[in-house]
Protein backbone atom coordinates (compact mmCIF):
# COMPACT_ATOMS: atom_id res chain seq x y z
CA UNK A 1 0.00 0.00 0.00
CA UNK A 2 1.39 3.38 -1.04
CA UNK A 3 1.37 6.68 0.84
CA UNK A 4 -1.81 8.77 0.80
CA UNK A 5 -2.09 12.48 0.04
CA UNK A 6 -3.80 13.90 3.12
CA UNK A 7 -2.09 17.19 3.94
CA UNK A 8 1.02 19.20 3.14
CA UNK A 9 3.15 17.04 5.42
CA UNK A 10 2.27 13.92 3.42
CA UNK A 11 3.57 15.29 0.12
CA UNK A 12 7.27 14.27 0.37
CA UNK A 13 6.40 10.61 0.93
CA UNK A 14 3.79 10.65 -1.85
CA UNK A 15 6.34 12.09 -4.28
CA UNK A 16 8.94 9.53 -3.19
CA UNK A 17 6.57 6.66 -3.97
CA UNK A 18 5.24 7.96 -7.31
CA UNK A 19 6.58 6.31 -10.45
CA UNK A 20 8.48 8.31 -13.04
CA UNK A 21 5.57 7.97 -15.46
CA UNK A 22 3.13 9.26 -12.84
CA UNK A 23 5.31 12.29 -12.20
CA UNK A 24 5.59 13.05 -15.90
CA UNK A 25 1.86 12.64 -16.42
CA UNK A 26 1.28 14.99 -13.50
CA UNK A 27 3.39 17.83 -14.89
CA UNK A 28 2.24 17.10 -18.45
CA UNK A 29 -1.47 17.41 -17.65
CA UNK A 30 -3.80 14.44 -18.11
CA UNK A 31 -6.31 16.04 -20.48
CA UNK A 32 -7.02 19.57 -21.70
CA UNK A 33 -8.13 20.94 -18.34
CA UNK A 34 -7.45 18.17 -15.80
CA UNK A 35 -4.39 16.99 -13.94
CA UNK A 36 -3.83 13.26 -13.53
CA UNK A 37 -5.55 11.56 -10.59
CA UNK A 38 -3.80 8.76 -8.70
CA UNK A 39 -6.65 6.98 -6.90
CA UNK A 40 -4.59 4.57 -4.79
CA UNK A 41 -2.66 7.52 -3.33
CA UNK A 42 -5.79 9.64 -2.78
CA UNK A 43 -4.51 12.21 -5.29
CA UNK A 44 -7.55 13.78 -6.98
CA UNK A 45 -7.56 15.49 -10.34
CA UNK A 46 -8.06 19.23 -10.35
CA UNK A 47 -10.01 21.11 -13.02
CA UNK A 48 -8.28 24.20 -14.47
CA UNK A 49 -10.19 26.55 -16.76
CA UNK A 50 -10.79 30.06 -18.04
CA UNK A 51 -11.96 32.46 -17.00
CA UNK A 52 -12.14 35.61 -15.01
CA UNK A 53 -15.38 36.72 -16.70
CA UNK A 54 -17.19 33.39 -16.41
CA UNK A 55 -17.05 29.76 -17.43
CA UNK A 56 -15.36 29.01 -20.77
CA UNK A 57 -17.71 26.70 -22.67
CA UNK A 58 -15.09 25.78 -25.24
CA UNK A 59 -12.83 24.49 -22.48
CA UNK A 60 -15.67 22.36 -21.10
CA UNK A 61 -16.20 20.58 -24.41
CA UNK A 62 -12.50 20.37 -25.25
CA UNK A 63 -11.70 18.80 -21.90
CA UNK A 64 -14.35 16.15 -22.51
CA UNK A 65 -13.00 15.40 -25.98
CA UNK A 66 -9.43 14.98 -24.72
CA UNK A 67 -10.28 12.44 -22.03
CA UNK A 68 -7.92 9.49 -22.71
CA UNK A 69 -10.68 7.14 -21.54
CA UNK A 70 -12.84 8.01 -24.53
CA UNK A 71 -10.39 8.94 -27.29
CA UNK A 72 -7.77 6.85 -29.10
CA UNK A 73 -5.69 9.98 -29.75
CA UNK A 74 -6.96 12.81 -27.51
CA UNK A 75 -4.78 15.38 -29.28
CA UNK A 76 -6.99 15.17 -32.38
CA UNK A 77 -9.75 16.84 -30.35
CA UNK A 78 -8.08 20.23 -30.81
CA UNK A 79 -9.10 20.13 -34.48
CA UNK A 80 -12.75 19.31 -33.75
CA UNK A 81 -14.95 22.10 -35.19
CA UNK A 82 -18.04 20.82 -33.40
CA UNK A 83 -16.90 22.19 -30.06
CA UNK A 84 -16.87 25.74 -31.45
CA UNK A 85 -20.27 25.39 -33.10
CA UNK A 86 -21.84 23.97 -29.95
CA UNK A 87 -21.07 27.02 -27.84
CA UNK A 88 -22.95 29.28 -30.25
CA UNK A 89 -26.36 27.65 -29.93
CA UNK A 90 -29.00 27.00 -27.28
CA UNK A 91 -28.53 23.47 -26.01
CA UNK A 92 -32.21 22.63 -26.40
CA UNK A 93 -31.97 23.59 -30.07
CA UNK A 94 -28.70 21.67 -30.37
CA UNK A 95 -30.26 18.50 -28.94
CA UNK A 96 -32.92 18.56 -31.64
CA UNK A 97 -30.56 19.60 -34.42
CA UNK A 98 -27.97 16.89 -33.75
CA UNK A 99 -30.34 14.07 -32.82
CA UNK A 100 -28.88 10.84 -34.18
CA UNK A 101 -25.30 12.19 -34.24
CA UNK A 102 -23.57 10.20 -31.48
CA UNK A 103 -20.62 12.59 -31.00
CA UNK A 104 -22.72 15.73 -30.92
CA UNK A 105 -25.30 14.13 -28.65
CA UNK A 106 -22.51 13.28 -26.21
CA UNK A 107 -21.21 16.83 -26.38
CA UNK A 108 -24.65 18.33 -25.81
CA UNK A 109 -25.16 16.13 -22.76
CA UNK A 110 -21.74 17.09 -21.40
CA UNK A 111 -22.27 20.82 -21.98
CA UNK A 112 -25.71 20.64 -20.37
CA UNK A 113 -24.06 19.75 -17.07
CA UNK A 114 -22.58 23.24 -17.06
CA UNK A 115 -25.40 25.21 -18.70
CA UNK A 116 -28.60 24.85 -16.63
CA UNK A 117 -31.72 24.79 -18.76
CA UNK A 118 -29.60 25.21 -21.86
CA UNK A 119 -28.88 28.85 -21.01
CA UNK A 120 -25.53 30.49 -21.51
CA UNK A 121 -23.50 31.17 -18.39
CA UNK A 122 -23.29 34.65 -16.99
CA UNK A 123 -20.76 36.97 -18.56
CA UNK A 124 -19.28 38.98 -15.72
CA UNK A 125 -17.74 42.46 -16.12
CA UNK A 126 -14.41 42.46 -17.92
CA UNK A 127 -11.19 43.62 -16.33
CA UNK A 128 -11.14 47.08 -17.88
CA UNK A 129 -14.62 47.76 -16.46
CA UNK A 130 -13.63 46.55 -13.01
CA UNK A 131 -10.49 48.69 -13.10
CA UNK A 132 -12.54 51.72 -14.16
CA UNK A 133 -14.50 51.49 -10.91
CA UNK A 134 -11.32 52.35 -8.97
CA UNK A 135 -12.87 50.33 -6.15
CA UNK A 136 -11.13 47.28 -4.64
CA UNK A 137 -14.34 46.31 -2.84
CA UNK A 138 -16.15 46.02 -6.17
CA UNK A 139 -13.27 43.97 -7.56
CA UNK A 140 -13.35 41.63 -4.57
CA UNK A 141 -17.14 41.24 -4.79
CA UNK A 142 -17.00 40.37 -8.49
CA UNK A 143 -14.08 38.02 -7.91
CA UNK A 144 -16.11 36.15 -5.30
CA UNK A 145 -19.12 35.90 -7.63
CA UNK A 146 -17.01 34.52 -10.48
CA UNK A 147 -15.40 32.09 -8.06
CA UNK A 148 -18.81 30.84 -6.93
CA UNK A 149 -19.93 30.31 -10.51
CA UNK A 150 -16.81 28.36 -11.43
CA UNK A 151 -16.77 26.29 -8.27
CA UNK A 152 -20.39 25.28 -8.81
CA UNK A 153 -19.29 23.97 -12.21
CA UNK A 154 -16.59 21.85 -10.57
CA UNK A 155 -13.67 24.11 -11.50
CA UNK A 156 -10.74 24.21 -9.06
CA UNK A 157 -8.39 26.73 -10.72
CA UNK A 158 -9.45 29.81 -12.68
CA UNK A 159 -7.06 31.14 -15.31
CA UNK A 160 -7.39 34.72 -14.21
CA UNK A 161 -7.20 37.51 -13.40
CA UNK A 162 -5.16 39.11 -16.17
CA UNK A 163 -2.78 41.45 -14.35
CA UNK A 164 -0.87 42.63 -17.41
CA UNK A 165 -0.55 46.37 -18.03
CA UNK A 166 -2.61 47.93 -20.84
CA UNK A 167 0.25 49.63 -22.68
CA UNK A 168 -0.68 49.31 -26.35
CA UNK A 169 -3.97 51.07 -27.21
CA UNK A 170 -4.44 48.56 -30.05
CA UNK A 171 -3.90 45.56 -27.77
CA UNK A 172 -6.54 42.96 -28.56
CA UNK A 173 -6.89 41.84 -24.94
CA UNK A 174 -6.85 45.20 -23.21
CA UNK A 175 -10.43 44.53 -22.13
CA UNK A 176 -9.14 41.79 -19.79
CA UNK A 177 -6.67 44.09 -18.06
CA UNK A 178 -7.41 46.54 -15.27
CA UNK A 179 -5.72 49.55 -16.85
CA UNK A 180 -2.41 51.21 -17.60
CA UNK A 181 -1.51 52.35 -14.09
CA UNK A 182 0.54 49.72 -12.22
CA UNK A 183 -0.77 50.67 -8.79
CA UNK A 184 -4.38 50.51 -9.97
CA UNK A 185 -3.68 47.10 -11.48
CA UNK A 186 -1.96 45.96 -8.28
CA UNK A 187 -4.75 46.94 -5.90
CA UNK A 188 -7.50 45.65 -8.19
CA UNK A 189 -5.74 42.35 -8.89
CA UNK A 190 -5.10 41.62 -5.21
CA UNK A 191 -8.73 42.34 -4.35
CA UNK A 192 -10.09 40.19 -7.18
CA UNK A 193 -7.83 37.31 -6.16
CA UNK A 194 -8.96 37.54 -2.53
CA UNK A 195 -12.59 37.48 -3.63
CA UNK A 196 -12.18 34.57 -6.00
CA UNK A 197 -10.20 32.42 -3.58
CA UNK A 198 -12.74 33.12 -0.82
CA UNK A 199 -15.16 31.00 -2.90
CA UNK A 200 -12.89 27.96 -2.55
CA UNK A 201 -11.05 27.93 -5.86
CA UNK A 202 -7.54 29.02 -6.81
CA UNK A 203 -6.94 32.13 -8.87
CA UNK A 204 -4.16 32.07 -11.49
CA UNK A 205 -2.67 35.50 -12.19
CA UNK A 206 -1.49 35.88 -15.80
CA UNK A 207 0.54 36.42 -18.00
CA UNK A 208 4.00 36.59 -16.44
CA UNK A 209 5.64 38.84 -17.69
CA UNK A 210 5.29 41.99 -19.88
CA UNK A 211 2.65 40.42 -22.12
CA UNK A 212 0.99 43.49 -23.59
CA UNK A 213 0.11 42.88 -27.23
CA UNK A 214 -1.52 40.20 -29.36
CA UNK A 215 0.39 41.00 -32.55
CA UNK A 216 3.25 38.49 -32.89
CA UNK A 217 2.77 37.56 -29.25
CA UNK A 218 4.52 34.21 -29.77
CA UNK A 219 7.69 35.78 -31.16
CA UNK A 220 7.94 39.33 -29.84
CA UNK A 221 10.36 40.37 -27.10
CA UNK A 222 9.53 42.98 -24.47
CA UNK A 223 12.86 44.70 -23.85
CA UNK A 224 13.03 46.60 -20.58
CA UNK A 225 15.28 47.58 -17.71
CA UNK A 226 15.11 45.93 -14.30
CA UNK A 227 13.55 49.03 -12.75
CA UNK A 228 10.81 49.22 -15.39
CA UNK A 229 10.23 45.48 -15.04
CA UNK A 230 9.74 45.68 -11.27
CA UNK A 231 7.91 48.99 -10.93
CA UNK A 232 5.62 48.64 -13.93
CA UNK A 233 5.17 45.12 -15.27
CA UNK A 234 5.72 43.00 -12.16
CA UNK A 235 3.81 45.22 -9.75
CA UNK A 236 0.45 43.51 -10.29
CA UNK A 237 1.97 40.08 -9.73
CA UNK A 238 3.78 41.29 -6.63
CA UNK A 239 0.50 42.54 -5.14
CA UNK A 240 -1.37 39.37 -6.12
CA UNK A 241 1.29 37.38 -4.25
CA UNK A 242 1.75 39.60 -1.17
CA UNK A 243 -1.77 40.95 -0.67
CA UNK A 244 -3.91 38.42 -2.53
CA UNK A 245 -1.97 35.26 -1.62
CA UNK A 246 -2.58 33.96 -5.13
CA UNK A 247 -2.07 30.20 -5.45
CA UNK A 248 -1.13 29.99 -9.12
CA UNK A 249 0.64 32.08 -11.79
CA UNK A 250 0.67 31.56 -15.56
CA UNK A 251 3.65 32.31 -17.79
CA UNK A 252 3.36 34.21 -21.07
CA UNK A 253 4.05 33.50 -24.74
CA UNK A 254 6.37 36.44 -25.33
CA UNK A 255 10.06 36.83 -24.60
CA UNK A 256 11.53 39.34 -22.16
CA UNK A 257 14.88 40.81 -23.15
CA UNK A 258 15.25 38.10 -25.78
CA UNK A 259 14.46 35.10 -23.55
CA UNK A 260 11.04 33.42 -23.78
CA UNK A 261 9.29 33.50 -20.43
CA UNK A 262 8.34 29.81 -20.41
CA UNK A 263 12.01 28.84 -20.74
CA UNK A 264 13.47 31.58 -18.56
CA UNK A 265 15.06 30.53 -15.27
CA UNK A 266 15.77 34.22 -14.65
CA UNK A 267 12.05 34.98 -14.69
CA UNK A 268 10.39 31.84 -13.33
CA UNK A 269 12.93 30.89 -10.67
CA UNK A 270 15.18 33.86 -9.89
CA UNK A 271 12.54 36.60 -10.15
CA UNK A 272 9.20 34.93 -9.43
CA UNK A 273 10.37 32.44 -6.82
CA UNK A 274 13.36 34.37 -5.51
CA UNK A 275 12.62 38.08 -5.52
CA UNK A 276 8.81 37.97 -5.46
CA UNK A 277 8.73 35.02 -3.02
CA UNK A 278 6.03 33.09 -4.87
CA UNK A 279 5.63 29.58 -3.48
CA UNK A 280 2.58 28.42 -5.45
CA UNK A 281 2.24 26.60 -8.76
CA UNK A 282 3.54 27.98 -12.07
CA UNK A 283 1.62 26.89 -15.17
CA UNK A 284 2.30 27.55 -18.84
CA UNK A 285 -0.01 29.42 -21.14
CA UNK A 286 -1.59 26.96 -23.56
CA UNK A 287 1.05 25.64 -25.93
CA UNK A 288 3.79 27.97 -24.67
CA UNK A 289 6.08 25.08 -23.74
CA UNK A 290 6.29 23.93 -27.36
CA UNK A 291 8.43 20.88 -28.05
CA UNK A 292 11.14 21.58 -25.47
CA UNK A 293 9.21 20.44 -22.43
CA UNK A 294 12.32 19.43 -20.49
CA UNK A 295 13.64 22.97 -21.01
CA UNK A 296 10.57 24.61 -19.52
CA UNK A 297 10.59 22.21 -16.54
CA UNK A 298 14.25 22.98 -15.90
CA UNK A 299 13.49 26.71 -15.98
CA UNK A 300 10.87 26.43 -13.24
CA UNK A 301 7.56 25.46 -14.89
CA UNK A 302 5.36 23.14 -12.83
CA UNK A 303 2.45 22.32 -15.15
CA UNK A 304 2.60 22.16 -18.97
CA UNK A 305 -0.69 23.02 -20.63
CA UNK A 306 -2.90 21.96 -22.23
CA UNK A 307 -2.91 18.19 -21.94
CA UNK A 308 -2.53 15.49 -22.77
CA UNK A 309 1.16 15.96 -23.56
CA UNK A 310 3.61 13.45 -24.97
CA UNK A 311 6.26 13.28 -22.24
CA UNK A 312 8.48 10.70 -23.95
CA UNK A 313 11.31 13.17 -24.54
CA UNK A 314 11.18 14.31 -20.91
CA UNK A 315 11.34 10.72 -19.71
CA UNK A 316 14.39 10.13 -21.87
CA UNK A 317 15.97 13.34 -20.56
CA UNK A 318 15.53 12.13 -16.97
CA UNK A 319 16.89 8.66 -17.76
CA UNK A 320 19.92 10.16 -19.50
CA UNK A 321 20.59 12.68 -16.73
CA UNK A 322 19.83 15.79 -18.79
CA UNK A 323 16.86 16.59 -16.55
CA UNK A 324 17.30 15.88 -12.86
CA UNK A 325 14.56 13.82 -11.22
CA UNK A 326 14.98 16.13 -8.23
CA UNK A 327 13.82 18.98 -10.47
CA UNK A 328 10.85 16.89 -11.55
CA UNK A 329 10.08 16.07 -7.91
CA UNK A 330 10.06 19.78 -7.11
CA UNK A 331 7.56 20.47 -9.91
CA UNK A 332 5.28 17.64 -8.76
CA UNK A 333 5.51 18.93 -5.19
CA UNK A 334 4.17 22.34 -6.23
CA UNK A 335 1.22 20.73 -8.01
CA UNK A 336 0.41 18.54 -5.02
CA UNK A 337 0.65 21.56 -2.72
CA UNK A 338 -1.87 23.34 -4.95
CA UNK A 339 -4.21 20.34 -4.83
CA UNK A 340 -4.01 20.09 -1.03
CA UNK A 341 -4.59 23.82 -0.50
CA UNK A 342 -7.61 23.85 -2.82
CA UNK A 343 -9.22 20.79 -1.28
CA UNK A 344 -8.58 22.03 2.27
CA UNK A 345 -10.19 25.38 1.41
CA UNK A 346 -13.19 23.66 -0.15
CA UNK A 347 -13.75 21.61 2.99
CA UNK A 348 -14.07 24.81 5.02
CA UNK A 349 -16.00 26.93 2.50
CA UNK A 350 -19.57 25.77 1.78
CA UNK A 351 -20.30 24.89 -1.84
CA UNK A 352 -22.28 27.72 -3.47
CA UNK A 353 -25.38 27.74 -5.62
CA UNK A 354 -24.37 29.34 -8.89
CA UNK A 355 -25.78 32.59 -10.20
CA UNK A 356 -26.78 30.79 -13.38
CA UNK A 357 -28.86 28.31 -11.39
CA UNK A 358 -30.43 31.15 -9.42
CA UNK A 359 -30.99 33.14 -12.64
CA UNK A 360 -29.61 36.07 -10.65
CA UNK A 361 -28.40 37.68 -13.86
CA UNK A 362 -32.04 38.16 -14.92
CA UNK A 363 -32.84 40.38 -11.93
CA UNK A 364 -32.87 44.20 -11.96
CA UNK A 365 -30.15 44.24 -9.28
CA UNK A 366 -27.73 42.43 -11.58
PLM-predicted stretches and their roles:
Residues 360-366:
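A short, hydrophobic C-terminal helix/tail in secreted or cell-surface proteins
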